[in-house]
């Protein structure tokens, strides 16, 4: 039986009495955003809206981005990546379970020296995957798009993790699972949080 979204007491500085709010609203007030599900257009639009709003409230305060996601739509993830780079607020990223596929790129895109992972968390790198069907000409167009996205992802990874093009291209060719220590050595994160 699902328990629903937990509620917690929260009191705004202007309120006289605390109110019950869902946990995500409460954490959002502390500038914490969660990527905790499969990325699709709707969810990425919510995250982008939150990033833009938090940045408009204060460009000097950090935004905390907690990640526990198996990835999802590459284009949705790239739109979050672009928004992270567009805003002025520095973003702290923290992997609290798994950062697979496009969510690993979002993890790596946090502010250098402010990218974290928990000790037993994992990272998965791999090339873009798309379902392709239709006429031969449509399949060719889709295949070219997948290759273009692969080049874009490789370029974005090397900008964020200081690896060579050949190393990243080789590693994303097949599923590449990384432990927290391996993710740190690879340059996806800067620190492993132990307490």
UniProtKB/Swiss-Prot annotation:
One of its GO terms (molecular function) is ATPase binding. It is an enzyme of class 3 (hydrolase). InterPro entries: ClpP (IPR001907), ClpP/crotonase-like_dom_sf (IPR029045), ClpP/TepA (IPR023562), ClpP_His_AS (IPR033135). CDD domains: S14_ClpP_2. It catalyses: Hydrolysis of proteins to small peptides in the presence of ATP and magnesium. alpha-casein is the usual test substrate. In the absence of ATP, only oligopeptides shorter than five residues are hydrolyzed (such as succinyl-Leu-Tyr-|-NHMec, and Leu-Tyr-Leu-|-Tyr-Trp, in which cleavage of the -Tyr-|-Leu- and -Tyr-|-Trp bonds also occurs). The keyword Protease applies. Its EC number is 3.4.21.92. Belongs to the peptidase S14 family. This is ATP-dependent Clp protease proteolytic subunit. The gene is clpP.
């Amino acid at each position: 039986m699902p328990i629903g979204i937990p509620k917690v007491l929260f009191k705004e500085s202007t309120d006289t009495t605390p109110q019950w709010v869902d946990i995500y609203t409460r954490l959002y007030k502390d500038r914490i955003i969660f990527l905790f599900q499969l990325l699709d257009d709707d969810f990425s639009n919510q995250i982008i809206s939150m990033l833009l709003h938090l940045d408009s409230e204060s460009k000097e305060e950090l935004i905390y981005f907690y990640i526990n996601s198996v990835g999802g739509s590459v284009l949705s993830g790239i739109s979050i990546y672009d928004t992270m780079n567009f805003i002025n607020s520095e973003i702290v990223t923290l992997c609290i379970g798994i950062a697979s596929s496009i969510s690993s790129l979002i993890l790596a895109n946090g502010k250098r020296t402010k990218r974290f992972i928990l000790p037993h968390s994992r990272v998965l790198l791999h090339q873009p995957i798309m379902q392709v069907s239709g006429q031969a000409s449509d399949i060719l167009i889709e295949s070219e798009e997948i290759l273009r996205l692969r080049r874009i992802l490789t370029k974005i990874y090397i900008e964020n993790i200081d690896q060579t093009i050949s190393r990243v291209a080789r590693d994303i060719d097949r599923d590449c699972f990384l432990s927290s220590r391996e993710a740190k050595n690879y340059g996806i994160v800067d620190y492993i949080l132990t307490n």
